[in-house]
Amino acid sequence: YQQLYICSKLIDVLKKIEKHGDIVGENGILVIPSVSNMSMDFGKRFWISDDTDLNRLFPGNPSGESGSRVAYAIMETTKGYRYGIHLPSFYLGGTFMPHIRLLDPEHGSTSLANLFGLPYVIEAKSRPFDRTTLHNNWQRNGTEAFSLYTGMTGKIDDELAAQAVSSILRFLTRMGIIRYYSHSGYIASVLKEGDLEPIMTEAAGI
């Protein structure tokens, strides 16, 4: 729900920017708030009919099962866009600081990730199952991909949502796609996912 809420707030701002003629030149911005509305209505994270994770079906197949056809349609619809910002849900509960995750970052992509102005950028090496994710397939199709983890999934957090919206608008402004005033944000700390260690408590409680 958090990701859908962020997209709705982002669209509200982008409509005003477009109305004032502040989308620069011939730039186009596409926002896809949700690709599985029925699943959300039932409070499910995966595809409602067969519990499939859509983010494991890319690049999709136009002649495949329904989820695979949806994945294919997303790839076709976003083909040719220079940048792609994915707001993935997270498979674990809890909250965390909003951050950008890069998969096998190419030269310069970390610098671009810093333009979001979030506290952290995580560099990760792709694993075999990443080959079927939206992020990986965008990259293979020539789209600079960023995964923006927004700090919450199943619930709505206004403060974290506002931070995510601001970071996207900041990136679009700094890339010369829109004209919009925003504060400078953070200078990101760049971390390698392989250097992170889980810390487990030995007992319940504080």
Question: Model features per residue range: what roles?
Answer:
Residues Y1-I206:
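Structured catalytic-domain cores with a bias toward divalent-metal coordination
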